[in-house]
Amino acid sequence: MRNVTILAACLFTASVSAAESNGEYIARISDCVACHTAEGGAAMAGGKKFPTPVGDIYSTNITPDKAQGIGNYSYEDFEKAVRQGIAKDGHPLYPAMPYPSYAKLSDEDVQALYRYFMHDVTPSAQPNKENAIPWLLSARWPLHIWNWLFTDAPATTVDSAKPDDNAALVKRGAYLVEGPGHCGSCHTPRGMAMNEKAYTHADAEYLSGAMIDGWYAPSLRGSGMSE
């Protein structure tokens, strides 16, 4: 009986380690560190400035620190922030956070991501910075309407791909590009409401090239890429 208990504990530990490893993989693909790390600041501790048409937005601390970060987030809180753009206290996040793309993340990948942030990311008490947005433009309630218009229902599962299954590999690639990779955030043109005009390769505008912060993100749809 003791041996069975030890074996079960080892298998559980191995599964947890695998989940956290996959969580780091998803975090890297999602490029969380690029937006949530300020120059000279702690990794994932936020504070990076993003100029927008309505003012400057600062990324938040997403380390597991309980005072400044997300250490008090349950999995349900985390999932809602990542895939629906809703913070723990219920306020909508600005879509500078690419949650319309992250809505495509599977339950399994979001769970792995949560484990990684809670167990492997180093906590930092670096304070969050206030956004520099004029008062009249700082109301968050219009973002609920924006979400209703421009986001999809969260995904739940995603098919795995075998090395010899080309169709499955293409599907897996689409998942990585459209979901965690959020390639469309830069390479898809935006509408009047700053929404991406498409979120899937089925739409011709998806990854068709766009201007962003004064530079041009070229089309990734294949035409001319080999030239």
What is the meaning of each model-derived region?
Residues 37, 42-68, 96-100, 149-159, ...:
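Sequence context of c-type cytochrome heme-c attachment sites
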Residues 52-79, 100-110, 201-227:
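Electron-transfer interface patches adjacent to heme c in soluble/periplasmic c-type cytochromes
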Residues 24-56, 84-92, 120-125, 178-213:
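Periplasmic/extracellular electron-transfer cofactor-ligation site
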Residues 1-17:
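Gram-negative bacterial Sec-dependent N-terminal signal peptides
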Residues 13-28, 147-178:
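Electrostatic cytochrome c docking/interface patches
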Residues 27, 78-81, 116:
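Conserved hydrophobic/aromatic "anchor" residues
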Residues 89-105:
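A cross-kingdom feature marking solvent-exposed beta-strand/loop segments within repeated
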Residues 125-143:
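Extended, well-folded interaction surfaces typified by the phenylalanyl-tRNA synthetase beta subunit core
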